[in-house]
Amino acid sequence: MSCSCTSSSSQESIQEDIMAKINNHPCYSEGAHQHYARIHVAVAPACNIQCNYCNRKYDCSNESRPGVTSSKLQPEEAVKKILFVGGEIQQLSVVGIAGPGDALANPEKTFKTFKMLYEKAPDLKMCLSTNGLMLPDYVDKIQQYNVDHVTVTINSVDETGEVGSRIYPWILWNHKKVFGKEAAKILLQRQLEGIKMLTDRGILVKANSVLIPGVNDQELPNVAKKLKELGVFLHNIMPLLSKEEYGTYYGLNGQASATDQEVMAAQEACGMDIPKKSTKSALLIFPSILNLKSINSMRRFLLHLLDAFADKSDFFVVSFSGFLFLPMILTLL
Protein backbone atom coordinates (compact mmCIF):
# COMPACT_ATOMS: atom_id res chain seq x y z
CA MET A 1 0.00 0.00 0.00
CA SER A 2 1.44 3.36 -1.01
CA CYS A 3 1.52 6.26 1.41
CA SER A 4 0.88 9.86 0.36
CA CYS A 5 2.56 11.29 3.45
CA THR A 6 5.89 13.11 3.05
CA SER A 7 8.76 11.97 5.26
CA SER A 8 10.55 14.43 7.52
CA SER A 9 13.78 14.00 5.56
CA SER A 10 12.08 14.83 2.26
CA GLN A 11 10.39 17.84 3.88
CA GLU A 12 13.78 19.09 5.04
CA SER A 13 15.14 18.59 1.53
CA ILE A 14 12.30 20.64 0.05
CA GLN A 15 12.86 23.42 2.60
CA GLU A 16 16.59 23.54 1.80
CA ASP A 17 15.82 23.70 -1.91
CA ILE A 18 13.35 26.55 -1.39
CA MET A 19 15.84 28.52 0.70
CA ALA A 20 18.46 28.12 -2.02
CA LYS A 21 16.00 29.50 -4.58
CA ILE A 22 15.16 32.44 -2.33
CA ASN A 23 18.77 33.33 -1.58
CA ASN A 24 19.77 33.40 -5.26
CA HIS A 25 16.77 35.29 -6.65
CA PRO A 26 16.92 39.12 -6.88
CA CYS A 27 13.15 39.42 -6.38
CA TYR A 28 13.21 37.68 -3.00
CA SER A 29 16.65 38.20 -1.49
CA GLU A 30 18.10 41.57 -0.52
CA GLY A 31 21.58 40.11 -0.77
CA ALA A 32 20.94 38.90 -4.32
CA HIS A 33 20.02 42.45 -5.35
CA GLN A 34 23.70 43.33 -5.47
CA HIS A 35 24.78 40.48 -7.71
CA TYR A 36 22.09 39.40 -10.15
CA ALA A 37 20.01 40.86 -12.99
CA ARG A 38 16.61 39.84 -14.32
CA ILE A 39 14.84 40.36 -17.63
CA HIS A 40 11.14 40.11 -18.54
CA VAL A 41 10.09 39.36 -22.11
CA ALA A 42 6.70 40.18 -23.59
CA VAL A 43 5.74 37.00 -25.47
CA ALA A 44 2.24 36.47 -24.01
CA PRO A 45 -0.26 39.06 -25.33
CA ALA A 46 -3.55 37.21 -24.82
CA CYS A 47 -5.48 37.03 -21.56
CA ASN A 48 -8.34 34.82 -20.39
CA ILE A 49 -9.90 37.06 -17.76
CA GLN A 50 -10.93 40.70 -17.57
CA CYS A 51 -9.82 42.64 -14.50
CA ASN A 52 -11.44 45.97 -13.74
CA TYR A 53 -8.01 47.44 -12.92
CA CYS A 54 -6.32 46.32 -16.13
CA ASN A 55 -5.88 47.75 -19.62
CA ARG A 56 -3.70 45.61 -21.88
CA LYS A 57 -3.08 48.27 -24.52
CA TYR A 58 0.58 48.94 -25.19
CA ASP A 59 2.92 50.95 -27.44
CA CYS A 60 0.92 54.16 -27.07
CA SER A 61 2.86 57.40 -27.63
CA ASN A 62 1.09 58.92 -24.62
CA GLU A 63 1.61 55.92 -22.33
CA SER A 64 2.02 56.86 -18.66
CA ARG A 65 1.32 53.59 -16.84
CA PRO A 66 4.22 51.82 -15.09
CA GLY A 67 5.63 48.58 -16.46
CA VAL A 68 3.97 48.67 -19.89
CA THR A 69 5.88 47.13 -22.79
CA SER A 70 6.39 48.94 -26.09
CA SER A 71 5.84 45.85 -28.26
CA LYS A 72 5.54 42.07 -28.14
CA LEU A 73 8.03 39.38 -29.12
CA GLN A 74 7.89 36.00 -30.76
CA PRO A 75 9.64 33.25 -28.74
CA GLU A 76 12.58 33.11 -31.17
CA GLU A 77 13.07 36.88 -30.90
CA ALA A 78 12.85 36.77 -27.12
CA VAL A 79 15.45 34.01 -26.81
CA LYS A 80 17.81 35.74 -29.24
CA LYS A 81 17.65 38.98 -27.29
CA ILE A 82 18.01 37.25 -23.92
CA LEU A 83 21.13 35.42 -25.07
CA PHE A 84 22.52 38.65 -26.52
CA VAL A 85 21.94 40.62 -23.33
CA GLY A 86 23.27 37.75 -21.22
CA GLY A 87 26.46 37.77 -23.25
CA GLU A 88 26.96 41.45 -22.50
CA ILE A 89 25.78 41.55 -18.89
CA GLN A 90 27.17 38.59 -17.00
CA GLN A 91 24.94 39.24 -13.97
CA LEU A 92 21.82 38.22 -15.90
CA SER A 93 20.42 35.18 -14.10
CA VAL A 94 16.60 35.39 -14.11
CA VAL A 95 14.16 35.42 -17.04
CA GLY A 96 10.46 36.05 -16.51
CA ILE A 97 7.30 35.98 -18.61
CA ALA A 98 4.47 38.09 -17.23
CA GLY A 99 2.49 39.32 -20.22
CA PRO A 100 1.48 41.73 -21.56
CA GLY A 101 -1.48 39.36 -21.13
CA ASP A 102 -1.21 36.18 -19.07
CA ALA A 103 1.64 33.70 -19.44
CA LEU A 104 -0.65 30.64 -19.24
CA ALA A 105 -3.28 32.07 -21.58
CA ASN A 106 -0.48 31.84 -24.19
CA PRO A 107 0.90 28.38 -23.35
CA GLU A 108 2.44 27.65 -26.75
CA LYS A 109 4.51 30.84 -26.84
CA THR A 110 5.34 30.77 -23.15
CA PHE A 111 6.58 27.19 -23.04
CA LYS A 112 8.30 27.41 -26.42
CA THR A 113 10.32 30.29 -24.98
CA PHE A 114 11.11 28.34 -21.81
CA LYS A 115 12.00 25.19 -23.78
CA MET A 116 14.45 27.05 -26.02
CA LEU A 117 16.05 28.77 -23.04
CA TYR A 118 16.23 25.51 -21.11
CA GLU A 119 18.15 23.98 -24.01
CA LYS A 120 20.40 26.96 -24.81
CA ALA A 121 20.97 28.47 -21.36
CA PRO A 122 20.14 25.87 -18.69
CA ASP A 123 21.73 27.93 -15.90
CA LEU A 124 19.17 30.71 -16.20
CA LYS A 125 16.41 30.76 -13.60
CA MET A 126 12.97 31.01 -15.16
CA CYS A 127 9.78 32.39 -13.66
CA LEU A 128 6.30 33.37 -14.75
CA SER A 129 3.33 35.38 -13.55
CA THR A 130 -0.27 34.29 -13.98
CA ASN A 131 -3.82 34.95 -12.85
CA GLY A 132 -4.01 31.23 -12.04
CA LEU A 133 -7.02 30.25 -14.14
CA MET A 134 -5.06 27.72 -16.20
CA LEU A 135 -2.42 26.96 -13.59
CA PRO A 136 -3.50 23.39 -12.68
CA ASP A 137 -3.29 22.37 -16.34
CA TYR A 138 0.34 23.45 -16.73
CA VAL A 139 2.07 22.56 -13.46
CA ASP A 140 3.71 19.55 -15.14
CA LYS A 141 5.18 21.72 -17.90
CA ILE A 142 6.25 24.36 -15.40
CA GLN A 143 8.24 21.70 -13.59
CA GLN A 144 9.49 20.10 -16.81
CA TYR A 145 11.27 23.25 -17.98
CA ASN A 146 12.68 24.07 -14.55
CA VAL A 147 10.46 27.09 -13.96
CA ASP A 148 10.94 27.26 -10.22
CA HIS A 149 9.36 30.63 -9.38
CA VAL A 150 5.68 31.41 -10.05
CA THR A 151 3.73 34.54 -9.12
CA VAL A 152 -0.06 34.29 -8.86
CA THR A 153 -2.35 37.31 -8.58
CA ILE A 154 -5.15 36.50 -6.14
CA ASN A 155 -7.42 39.26 -4.86
CA SER A 156 -10.12 37.39 -2.94
CA VAL A 157 -10.86 34.03 -1.36
CA ASP A 158 -14.57 34.76 -0.93
CA GLU A 159 -16.24 31.46 -1.85
CA THR A 160 -19.57 33.16 -2.65
CA GLY A 161 -17.97 35.03 -5.55
CA GLU A 162 -19.42 38.34 -4.36
CA VAL A 163 -16.08 40.12 -3.94
CA GLY A 164 -14.52 38.54 -7.00
CA SER A 165 -17.44 39.53 -9.22
CA ARG A 166 -16.69 43.19 -8.44
CA ILE A 167 -13.11 42.72 -9.63
CA TYR A 168 -13.51 40.34 -12.59
CA PRO A 169 -16.45 40.97 -14.99
CA TRP A 170 -15.77 37.74 -16.86
CA ILE A 171 -13.38 34.87 -17.49
CA LEU A 172 -12.84 32.79 -20.62
CA TRP A 173 -13.46 29.21 -19.54
CA ASN A 174 -13.91 26.14 -21.75
CA HIS A 175 -14.10 28.32 -24.86
CA LYS A 176 -16.89 30.56 -23.58
CA LYS A 177 -17.24 33.64 -21.42
CA VAL A 178 -18.47 33.10 -17.88
CA PHE A 179 -19.70 36.14 -15.96
CA GLY A 180 -20.23 37.43 -12.43
CA LYS A 181 -20.12 35.28 -9.30
CA GLU A 182 -19.83 32.03 -11.24
CA ALA A 183 -16.71 33.33 -12.97
CA ALA A 184 -15.19 34.44 -9.67
CA LYS A 185 -15.84 31.07 -8.04
CA ILE A 186 -14.27 29.14 -10.93
CA LEU A 187 -11.21 31.41 -10.88
CA LEU A 188 -10.74 31.03 -7.13
CA GLN A 189 -11.05 27.25 -7.23
CA ARG A 190 -8.44 27.04 -10.00
CA GLN A 191 -6.08 29.44 -8.25
CA LEU A 192 -6.13 27.52 -4.97
CA GLU A 193 -5.76 24.17 -6.73
CA GLY A 194 -2.82 25.37 -8.81
CA ILE A 195 -1.00 27.00 -5.90
CA LYS A 196 -1.30 23.81 -3.85
CA MET A 197 0.08 21.74 -6.73
CA LEU A 198 3.07 24.06 -7.05
CA THR A 199 3.98 24.18 -3.37
CA ASP A 200 3.61 20.41 -3.07
CA ARG A 201 6.35 20.11 -5.71
CA GLY A 202 8.66 22.59 -4.01
CA ILE A 203 8.10 25.31 -6.61
CA LEU A 204 8.43 28.73 -5.03
CA VAL A 205 5.15 30.69 -5.09
CA LYS A 206 4.71 34.40 -4.57
CA ALA A 207 1.23 35.94 -4.47
CA ASN A 208 0.24 39.45 -5.50
CA SER A 209 -2.95 41.11 -4.29
CA VAL A 210 -4.26 44.46 -5.50
CA LEU A 211 -5.75 46.54 -2.70
CA ILE A 212 -9.02 48.00 -4.01
CA PRO A 213 -10.57 50.35 -1.44
CA GLY A 214 -14.15 49.46 -0.61
CA VAL A 215 -13.99 46.26 -2.66
CA ASN A 216 -11.48 43.78 -1.20
CA ASP A 217 -9.76 45.69 1.61
CA GLN A 218 -11.66 43.72 4.26
CA GLU A 219 -11.02 40.48 2.37
CA LEU A 220 -7.23 40.63 2.21
CA PRO A 221 -6.61 39.21 5.73
CA ASN A 222 -8.55 36.12 4.63
CA VAL A 223 -6.40 35.95 1.50
CA ALA A 224 -3.23 36.13 3.58
CA LYS A 225 -4.44 33.37 5.90
CA LYS A 226 -5.30 31.03 3.02
CA LEU A 227 -2.01 31.68 1.24
CA LYS A 228 -0.08 30.85 4.38
CA GLU A 229 -1.99 27.58 4.69
CA LEU A 230 -1.04 26.71 1.10
CA GLY A 231 2.67 27.32 1.68
CA VAL A 232 3.04 30.53 -0.33
CA PHE A 233 6.39 32.09 0.45
CA LEU A 234 5.65 35.77 -0.12
CA HIS A 235 2.45 37.82 -0.22
CA ASN A 236 2.75 41.24 -1.83
CA ILE A 237 -0.05 43.80 -1.43
CA MET A 238 -0.05 46.42 -4.16
CA PRO A 239 -2.12 49.63 -4.27
CA LEU A 240 -4.77 50.04 -6.95
CA LEU A 241 -3.75 52.69 -9.48
CA SER A 242 -6.91 54.00 -11.09
CA LYS A 243 -6.18 57.28 -12.82
CA GLU A 244 -8.68 58.10 -15.54
CA GLU A 245 -5.95 58.33 -18.18
CA TYR A 246 -5.06 54.67 -17.58
CA GLY A 247 -8.26 53.71 -19.37
CA THR A 248 -9.33 50.97 -16.96
CA TYR A 249 -12.90 50.31 -15.84
CA TYR A 250 -12.05 51.46 -12.34
CA GLY A 251 -10.26 54.54 -13.61
CA LEU A 252 -13.10 55.58 -15.89
CA ASN A 253 -15.76 54.98 -13.23
CA GLY A 254 -14.29 56.88 -10.30
CA GLN A 255 -12.93 54.03 -8.17
CA ALA A 256 -10.44 55.56 -5.74
CA SER A 257 -6.81 54.52 -5.81
CA ALA A 258 -5.34 53.01 -2.66
CA THR A 259 -3.32 55.37 -0.48
CA ASP A 260 -0.05 54.55 1.25
CA GLN A 261 -1.89 54.59 4.57
CA GLU A 262 -4.47 52.10 3.30
CA VAL A 263 -1.74 49.78 2.04
CA MET A 264 0.04 49.89 5.40
CA ALA A 265 -3.23 49.23 7.22
CA ALA A 266 -3.89 46.23 4.97
CA GLN A 267 -0.39 44.89 5.55
CA GLU A 268 -0.83 45.18 9.31
CA ALA A 269 -4.25 43.51 9.13
CA CYS A 270 -2.62 40.65 7.23
CA GLY A 271 0.01 40.23 9.93
CA MET A 272 2.91 41.38 7.80
CA ASP A 273 6.09 42.80 9.27
CA ILE A 274 6.10 46.45 8.21
CA PRO A 275 9.64 47.83 7.85
CA LYS A 276 10.43 51.35 8.90
CA LYS A 277 10.56 53.90 6.13
CA SER A 278 13.47 52.92 3.94
CA THR A 279 16.44 55.26 3.62
CA LYS A 280 17.69 53.39 0.58
CA SER A 281 17.72 55.24 -2.71
CA ALA A 282 16.83 53.98 -6.17
CA LEU A 283 18.49 55.16 -9.34
CA LEU A 284 16.43 55.07 -12.54
CA ILE A 285 18.49 55.30 -15.69
CA PHE A 286 17.08 56.12 -19.12
CA PRO A 287 19.62 55.53 -21.92
CA SER A 288 18.00 58.15 -24.16
CA ILE A 289 18.60 60.83 -21.53
CA LEU A 290 22.19 59.74 -20.98
CA ASN A 291 22.74 59.52 -24.75
CA LEU A 292 24.47 56.16 -24.40
CA LYS A 293 24.05 54.88 -27.93
CA SER A 294 26.10 51.71 -27.89
CA ILE A 295 25.83 48.61 -25.78
CA ASN A 296 29.50 48.89 -24.81
CA SER A 297 29.09 52.41 -23.47
CA MET A 298 25.97 51.32 -21.56
CA ARG A 299 27.77 48.31 -20.14
CA ARG A 300 30.78 50.39 -19.06
CA PHE A 301 28.49 52.95 -17.46
CA LEU A 302 26.53 50.35 -15.50
CA LEU A 303 29.60 48.47 -14.34
CA HIS A 304 31.09 51.77 -13.19
CA LEU A 305 27.93 52.46 -11.17
CA LEU A 306 27.95 49.01 -9.61
CA ASP A 307 31.59 49.42 -8.61
CA ALA A 308 30.98 52.91 -7.26
CA PHE A 309 28.03 51.88 -5.10
CA ALA A 310 29.07 48.35 -4.18
CA ASP A 311 29.95 49.38 -0.64
CA LYS A 312 27.06 51.80 -0.14
CA SER A 313 24.31 50.47 2.10
CA ASP A 314 21.86 53.05 0.77
CA PHE A 315 22.05 51.81 -2.82
CA PHE A 316 19.83 48.90 -3.69
CA VAL A 317 18.77 48.86 -7.31
CA VAL A 318 19.82 50.12 -10.69
CA SER A 319 16.94 49.94 -13.12
CA PHE A 320 16.69 51.04 -16.70
CA SER A 321 14.15 50.64 -19.46
CA GLY A 322 14.20 51.11 -23.20
CA PHE A 323 17.55 49.31 -23.43
CA LEU A 324 18.49 49.35 -27.13
CA PHE A 325 14.78 49.80 -27.74
CA LEU A 326 14.16 46.18 -26.78
CA PRO A 327 10.56 45.38 -25.78
CA MET A 328 11.52 44.20 -22.33
CA ILE A 329 12.31 45.42 -18.88
CA LEU A 330 15.82 44.76 -17.65
CA THR A 331 16.63 45.38 -14.02
CA LEU A 332 20.03 45.11 -12.44
CA LEU A 333 19.61 44.15 -8.81
Identify the residue ranges that each predicted region occupies:
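Canonical Radical SAM [4Fe-4S] cluster-binding loop centered on the CxxxCxxC motif
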Residues: 7, 16-18, 27-74
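Intrinsically disordered, low-complexity segments enriched in small polar residues
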Residues: 313, 319-322
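Conserved N-terminal glycine/acidic-rich loop preference
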Residues: 20-22, 27-31, 35, 86-103, ...
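Auxiliary Fe-S-binding modules of radical SAM enzymes
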Residues: 1-31, 35, 217, 221-310, ...
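Conserved AdoMet/S-adenosylmethionine-binding subsite of the radical SAM
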Residues: 104-238
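Conserved alpha-helical substructure of the radical SAM core
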Residues: 57-97, 107-112
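Short glycine-enriched, charge-decorated loop/helix-capping segments at active-site entrances
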Residues: 65-70, 166-171, 180-181, 250-256
